[in-house]
Amino acid sequence: MDKNKIKVLIIDDSAVTRNILSLELAKYPEIEVVGTAIDPYIARNKIVKLEPDVITLDIEMPRMDGITFLEKLMRYHPMPVIIIGSITDSGYQTALRFIELATTETVNKPRFIDSY
């Protein structure tokens, strides 16, 4: 790992989304994807081991939703977070809750991304 690069951990249950984000971020020489996780429990262990500078976090995942994970993360290991998820009209309040919990950025995931 290059210490001058921004280390990113991608947390998303969709293999397609993890792959697309990894490929897109690889285009930037100053960014290094240090790992991926399919759920918050795996992510927790990887955060401790890999020490990312920033994480991308899906809103809806199995075993623990993104809000619950973000609340725990900000309490015990605060760090920059970019939310990646499908934000519909009904999910607007969810997006606001993420912002309240210190989300660095929220990115709306295109609805077709998981259908590939």
Whereabouts are the PLM-identified features?
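Two-component/phosphorelay signaling modules centered on CheY-like receiver
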Residues: K3-I6, A15-G35
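Active-site residues of response regulator receiver
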Residues: D12, D58
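Acidic catalytic/metal-coordinating carboxylates
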Residues: D39-I42, M64-T68
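Conserved phosphotransfer cores of two-component systems
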Residues: V48-L50, L73-M79, L101
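Active-site beta3 strand of CheY-like receiver
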Residues: L50-T56
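Receiver (REC) domain active-site loop signature in two-component systems and cognate sites
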Residues: M61
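Alpha4 helix (beta4-alpha4-beta5 surface) of REC/receiver domains from two-component response regulators
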Residues: T68, R75, T88-S115
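Hydrophobic/aromatic residues positioned on beta-strands within the core alpha/beta folds
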Residues: I84-S86
